[in-house]
Amino acid sequence: MASIAILGGGAWGTALAASLTVNGHTVMLWARRRQTCDAINARNENVQYLPGITLPAALCASPDMAYVCAGADLIVLAVPSCYLAEVAALMNTTPRFQRLRTAAVGQEYPLIGILTKGFIPDQEGMPHLITDALGALLPSGAHGQLVYISGPSHAQEVAQGKVTGLIAASQNPMAAIRVRELLRSKRVQVYSSLDVVGVQVCAAVKNVIAIAFGLLDAMAEHSEAFGDNTESMLLAAGLNEIQTIGKQLGSTHPETFTSLAGIGDLDVTCRSAYGRNRRFGRDIVHKGILDSFSGIQDLVSRLPEVGYLAEGVVACMHVQRLAERDRLKVPICAGLYAILNREKGADTFMQEILGW
């Protein structure tokens, strides 16, 4: 059994921490809010993000990152992309990482798992993959220990012990295999991959497609023109756009897009009632949620006002930058960008991408 640190007290981080604790690992969860830690330790519940789900009594939480990371064999970053740089900076200030900065590249570095989805922009606003951005933030000795974890895995179901499949992707095959074995259990199947680029692109862009799915879902309630066939059209077209972006950014394995990381994660994100991005698409139609914003830049800067985190909004802005730079044909992503930027309505969007 291993010692594992989960950095992030949201739903997904808490769910994975619970699963790993049930597996017999010693797990420490870091959360910024002391109230979250106190509730987990005293009541075995993450009241804010996983209400009603009883967590293992052996799972401990702390707001002290140095304490949580001190002896971990695996450190998992489970924070939204907008907080990744800040959390990585905090991790760098811990005594353990301060010591490791002076050490040679080797086995002293813990494995570093990454659950964060999306892209990280540079100072010019050009987006980069999570592992590339994180590699620039962490000591060079940690680069070979980075493992990206993704797949169709709603936090609520993982916390409830429902059977789930994940992909552990890394440029270092041994690191991917080690994380695979740590995460694997009777209820969680994990497969290793070397296509760390493709897996990350799938994880980021599927949230954009899910917003479009929410639009379609809401519009279907008032139109006889849309049905299951239409959803399959959108799903297939969305997967094609994900593959287009993945190939451009350097994906090495075409099968990634038909794996758990690709079609698997896309399907559950688009169809499940748990999905915040699908919910956002529905809210565009039913609640006019975009009416309070002047465009996508305004929306991104005030996204917390929505009341829940729809990561596909920010991802859509980044995909547009990539598409413009590399002249990529991604009509769903481009059309959705136009909607979020208040340039186009949902009806026009559906007519253009579905020929309706």
Swiss-Prot record:
Keywords of this entry: Cytoplasm, Lipid biosynthesis, Lipid metabolism, NAD, NADP, Nucleotide-binding, Oxidoreductase, Phospholipid biosynthesis, Phospholipid metabolism
Keyword NADP among record annotations: yes
Main location: cytoplasm
rRNA processing found in the keyword field: no
A single GO cellular-component term on record: cytosol
Pfam hit, one: NAD_Gly3P_dh_C
Location in the cell: Cytoplasm
Domain of life from the UniProt record: Bacteria
Reaction(s) this enzyme catalyzes, per UniProt: sn-glycerol 3-phosphate + NAD(+) = dihydroxyacetone phosphate + NADH + H(+); sn-glycerol 3-phosphate + NADP(+) = dihydroxyacetone phosphate + NADPH + H(+)
PROSITE patterns for the chain: NAD_G3PDH (PS00957)
Active site: K206 (proton acceptor)
Binding-site residues for sn-glycerol 3-phosphate, renumbered to this chain: K117, G151, S153, K206, D265, R276, N277
Pathway the protein contributes to: Membrane lipid metabolism; glycerophospholipid metabolism
GO molecular function: glycerol-3-phosphate dehydrogenase [NAD(P)+] activity; NAD binding
Record-listed E.C. numbers: 1.1.1.94
Annotated NADPH binding sites: W12, R32, R33, K117, A155, R276, L309, E311
Gene Ontology biological process terms, A to Z: carbohydrate metabolic process; glycerol-3-phosphate biosynthetic process; glycerol-3-phosphate catabolic process; glycerophospholipid metabolic process; phospholipid biosynthetic process
Function: Catalyzes the reduction of the glycolytic intermediate dihydroxyacetone phosphate (DHAP) to sn-glycerol 3-phosphate (G3P), the key precursor for phospholipid synthesis.
Family statement drawn from the similarity comment of this UniProt entry: Belongs to the NAD-dependent glycerol-3-phosphate dehydrogenase family.
Protein name, per record: Glycerol-3-phosphate dehydrogenase [NAD(P)+]
Gene source species: Treponema pallidum (strain Nichols)
Protein's gene: gpsA
